[in-house]
Amino acid sequence: MPQRLIPALALSAAAALFASNAAASSGDAWEAFRTEVSKKCLSAATSLEKASAVVDPFGSKSFGLALVIGTPKGSKTAVTQICVYDKHKKTVELGGELTPETVTIKAPAKAR
């Protein structure tokens, strides 16, 4: 094997290893982000029973976005609220309750 080829192969292997670790970290970071948005949105939805959150996988540049679906206490009809998570302040705000006549949303069976 030529002497010049060994450093090139070592550099290629190191680059591939770094890229795979970066991709895994990035995936882990996005999963942690989605978990944080879900937890914060569900905690803020105190007026809803049996609430679940459907999180936009990446949100926007500044905000995480989710739909929170649940039944208002004392009601039998499910509603949806839009939840906005500020990525910098780590705070959430909920929109008003959207009824099924306004928007139709079906939460996936695996929603939290």
What are these regions (language model features)?
Residues 5, 20-112:
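Mitochondrial intermembrane space
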Residues 1-23:
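Classic N-terminal secretory signal peptides
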